Design a protein with these regions (language model features):
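Conserved donor nucleotide-binding strand/loop of the catalytic core
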Residues: 78-90
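Residue-level signal for inorganic ion chemistry
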Residues: 22, 48, 97, 111-112, ...
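Short, positively charged low-complexity motifs
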Residues: 1-9
């Protein structure tokens, strides 16, 4: 049975434990590269290494699970984090990572390794919201005019004033996210992010202002842009 969606937030030291699931099992066909996306080099480091470094250096995170393609399992051997094989879909991969967290992990940060420019400032903003028992995601207000299309014809212009682009990390009470995955499996539902699963439980999810540079690497152009951003930061 699903647990309660609301209630007192964890207060003891044991219950303040935070974990992170870094999803790095995607193939990245749109990058036109035979290497799994998270292992494509960005300034000489694998893409997933940037997210790993961000979470390893963030003191509130005590349990990290990296989810990667099965054939890459031998690429990492480090006692500071766990490595598990991904599933057939992103949703299955996140669930495998979630299942590998220590059982007393109260909160979980779920992050796409395809977003390598994660900062400690963004992690701080998310934790400030999450530590009071809230579920929250990083997001950025949409500035473009958004068209709802039917095939290639405009069906409607949406009011962008209330539209946000979801990012990661997304942070949840671990018990709530597990309940959300149980319901999704029961209903045979596939969502595009974790928040969409939690929303189906009736649980609230807060938007935390993300970072305009927290881009998702999807195309070769995105990879080049990330390189330029890193060059200017260094």
């Amino acid at each position: 049975m699903p647990g309660k969606l609301t209630g007192s937030s964890p207060t003891t030291t044991a219950k303040m434990k935070c974990g992170a699931v870094i999803v790095a099992a995607g193939r990245g066909e749109r990058l036109k590269n035979t290497t799994p996306k998270a292992f494509i080099p960005l300034r000489s480091k694998p893409l997933c290494q940037y997210s790993l470094d961000a979470f390893l250096s963030y003191p509130k995170i005590t349990d990290i699970v990296l989810v990667i393609p099965e054939e890459k399992l031998s690429s990492f051997s480090d006692p500071k984090f766990k490595v598990v094989a991904g599933g057939a879909s992103r949703q299955e991969s996140v669930f495998k990572g979630l299942s590998a967290l220590e059982c007393d992990t109260a909160w979980v940060f779920v992050h796409d390794a395809a977003r390598p420019l994660l900062t400690a400032d963004l992690l701080d903003r998310l934790w400030e919201s999450a530590k009071n028992g809230k579920n929250c995601i990083a997001a950025w207000p949409i500035s473009d005019t958004v068209k709802l299309a039917q095939n290639t014809t405009i069906a409607k212009t949406l009011d962008r004033q209330n539209l946000w682009g979801a990012q990661t990390p997304q942070v949840f009470l671990t018990s709530v996210l597990k309940d959300a995955y149980a319901k999704a499996k029961k209903d045979n539902f596939t969502g595009t992010d974790e928040a969409s699963l939690v929303e189906r439980l009736g649980a609230s999810v807060e938007l935390v202002v993300g970072d305009p540079w927290n881009l998702k690497i999807t195309t070769p152009q995105d990879l080049k842009l990330a390189e330029l951003i890193l060059e200017n930061k260094l």
